[in-house]
Amino acid sequence: MNNLIIIAVASWLVLGALCKKDGYPYDGNNCKYDCWKNQYCDDLCKKKKGASGYCYALNLSCYCYGLPDKEKTSVKTKCYKGR
């Protein structure tokens, strides 16, 4: 019985860690979301099912916490903004 409880708790911890990630969300053109205000990014991240977000001042891009695994937080192709 104790082993079953340990396995259940370990599985819950692993699934919780694997289901959420932090990073810069990307749009359909593989571009980061530009920003000036934290509230815009927080709203964007929550819309994407994240926990919260803010505007990272050094690159003026939204950064999100707690995004689902299916959400893109890195891309291998260039941003195609304006094409």
UniProtKB/Swiss-Prot annotation:
Residues 1-19 form the signal peptide. PROSITE patterns: LCN_CSAB. Expressed by the venom gland. Disulfide bonds join C31-C79, C35-C55, C41-C62, C45-C64. GO terms for cellular component: extracellular region. Residues 21-80 form the LCN-type CS-alpha/beta domain. It comes from the Eukaryota. CDD domains: neurotoxins_LC_scorpion (cd23106). It is found in: Secreted. Belongs to the long (4 C-C) scorpion toxin superfamily. Sodium channel inhibitor family. Alpha subfamily. Has the structural arrangement of an alpha-helix connected to antiparallel beta-sheets by disulfide bonds (CS-alpha/beta). This is Neurotoxin LmNaTx30.
